[in-house]
């Protein structure tokens, strides 16, 4: 069954411009308070100009272009401009450092990068080291360094016509994006997302929160994340609603932004809720038009009740991951909600709890949460150039193993219990323990290392490192944290360090992590 009617992203934007014309499509607010607004017609024209820009730089169907950007209009222009010419977006987490960004460039085969001045020195060094296939960099800032292979994105875009110059044949099965996500291995994997995936995500997420064209969907989630793209942006655009993209989250500013833009839908993670709750109470806390707050794991019932009571909102729970594209289990529009359940399987999906032998379990029994979808349509297509990793999580008949533990009740409500894999959830970011351990293990004084997540009242989990030093060595906290800050993104840097004589292991030599909690 073709739910999206065979329409790829190029057709979507041409249709949206025709149908909604001068209606506001996108509002972007920068950290400095600068606001840019675009109608559906204007946004489609900016997307066309950006597509033409890429074409003039030699980008063709199937080429990969990396984006290392904070939330900004240019991210939206590039995302859909690339899709219009059949090229592939490779978003890079804006908080990653050189080593991590180099890995993504190398393993995505990106040949062009769009970024801003603050990240340019890092990529200049990457180019000098000849560590990737990058042949050109576009900077979105007005000031431009006098370096070869660097262009002004804005100047080039403004020179382009507002009609599309290059329109190769497209299929909904074509890849639109490769989104690298942390896993249980030491390196991130590239999740392949098709035009169909994104079109379906728009319709599905719009259904999930009963979105209409008179809604205003505001998000502070980073544009390089799947939730901003598929739960928010694609939902808003697919419904002809207004999408408000705020550059950075500020607990002090957030509620004022919700009120200023008359938002009817927004999304929150636990870190946001906790930081909002410590703001001074205001008589205007309930002065808003929010109908739903899309919510993602994990919050206590006490915290949930206090937040909903203070701000007069309801939380619509949604559970998913990059590989599922959308929140495949969640609360349904008009249906009852059963906190702390994560909801029931959404339309087009099946969900089961399975045991270690891949057999379905009855209600009430703990096991792995597994989801059935259609690869390349309702769930991701594959991991880029990694068939072994794909086969490990995705069965031939479309069953996806999430690696998460949970159970369901007799009415089909699912409950999330814990993450099976060694992942730490930190302020909305997934952090791989193995990745951090491999980096820290390169310190010359460290013999053994394990990192674990510990409960944090603000950011879900904090990161604690347990290390064993080489004989005769000493290591100060200052030296340790300085090393980490130089070798990994800030959000991955451990908050705590404990030096031990040894680490607890089982008979097979594996570290017993639960003994370190």
UniProtKB/Swiss-Prot annotation:
Catalysed transformations (reactions): 4-(trimethylamino)butanoate + ATP + CoA = 4-(trimethylamino)butanoyl-CoA + AMP + diphosphate; crotonobetaine + ATP + CoA = crotonobetainyl-CoA + AMP + diphosphate; (R)-carnitine + ATP + CoA = (R)-carnitinyl-CoA + AMP + diphosphate
Entry-linked CDD domains: FACL_DitJ_like
Keywords attached to this entry: Ligase
Molecular functions (GO terms): carnitine-CoA ligase activity; crotonobetaine-CoA ligase activity; medium-chain fatty acid-CoA ligase activity
Pathway: Amine and polyamine metabolism; carnitine metabolism
Signal peptide: none
One GO-annotated biological process of the protein: fatty acid metabolic process
One Pfam family per UniProt: AMP-binding_C
EC number: 6.2.1.48
Family as reported in the entry's similarity comment: Belongs to the ATP-dependent AMP-binding enzyme family.
Role noted for this protein: Catalyzes the transfer of CoA to carnitine, generating the initial carnitinyl-CoA needed for the CaiB reaction cycle. Also has activity toward crotonobetaine and gamma-butyrobetaine.
Name this polypeptide is given: Crotonobetaine/carnitine--CoA ligase
Name of the gene this protein is made from: caiC
């Amino acid at each position: 069954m073709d739910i999206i009617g065979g329409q790829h992203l190029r057709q979507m934007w041409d249709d949206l411009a025709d149908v909604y014309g001068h209606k506001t499509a996108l509002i972007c607010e920068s950290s400095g308070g600068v606001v840019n607004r675009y109608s559906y017609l204007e946004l489609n024209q900016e997307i066309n100009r950006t597509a033409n820009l890429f074409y003039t730089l030699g980008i063709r169907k199937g080429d990969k272009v990396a984006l290392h950007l904070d939330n900004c209009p240019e991210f939206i222009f590039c995302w859909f401009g690339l899709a219009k010419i059949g090229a592939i977006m490779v978003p890079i987490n804006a908080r990653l450092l050189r080593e991590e960004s180099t890995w993504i460039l190398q393993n995505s085969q990106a040949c062009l990068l769009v970024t801003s001045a603050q990240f340019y020195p890092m990529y200049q060094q990457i180019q000098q080291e000849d560590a990737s296939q990058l042949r050109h960099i576009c900077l979105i800032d007005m000031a431009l360094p006098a370096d070869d292979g660097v262009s002004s994105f804005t100047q080039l875009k403004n020179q382009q016509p507002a009609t599309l110059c290059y329109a190769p044949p497209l299929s909904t099965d074509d890849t639109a994006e490769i989104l690298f996500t942390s896993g249980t291995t030491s390196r991130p994997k590239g999740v392949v997302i098709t035009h169909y995936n994104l079109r379906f995500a728009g319709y599905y997420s719009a259904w999930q929160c009963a979105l209409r064209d008179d809604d205003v969907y505001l998000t502070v989630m980073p544009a390089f994340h799947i939730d901003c793209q598929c739960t928010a942006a694609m939902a808003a655009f697919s419904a002809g609603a207004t999408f408000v993209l705020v550059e950075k989250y500020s607990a002090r500013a957030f509620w004022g932004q919700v009120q200023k833009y008359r938002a009817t839908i927004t999304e929150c993670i636990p870190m946001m809720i906790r930081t909002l709750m410590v703001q001074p109470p205001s008589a205007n806390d309930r002065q808003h038009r929010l109908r739903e707050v899309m919510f993602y794991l994990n919050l206590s019932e006490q915290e949930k009740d206090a937040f909903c009571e203070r701000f007069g909102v309801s939380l619509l729970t949604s559970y998913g991951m990059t590989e599922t594209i959308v929140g495949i289990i969640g609360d349904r529009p008009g249906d009852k909600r059963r906190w702390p359940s994560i909801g029931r399987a959404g339309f087009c999906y099946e969900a089961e709890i399975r045991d270690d032998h891949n057999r379905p379990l009855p209600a009430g029994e703990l096991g792995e949460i597994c989801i059935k979808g259609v690869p390349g349509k309702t769930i991701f297509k594959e991991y880029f150039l990694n068939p072994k990793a794909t086969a490990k999580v995705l069965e031939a008949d479309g069953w996806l193993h999430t690696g998460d533990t949970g159970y369901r009740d007799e009415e089909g409500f699912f409950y999330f219990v814990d993450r099976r894999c060694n992942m730490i959830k930190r302020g909305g970011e997934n952090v791989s323990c193995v990745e951090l351990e491999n980096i820290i293990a390169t310190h010359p004084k460290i013999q053994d290392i394990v990192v674990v997540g510990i409960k944090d009242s603000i950011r879900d989990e904090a990161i604690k490192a347990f290390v064993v030093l080489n004989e005769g060595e000493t290591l100060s906290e200052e030296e340790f944290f300085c090393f980490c800050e130089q070798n990994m993104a800030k959000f991955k840097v451990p908050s705590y360090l404990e030096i031990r004589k040894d680490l607890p292991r089982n008979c097979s030599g594996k570290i017993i992590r639960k003994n370190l909690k």
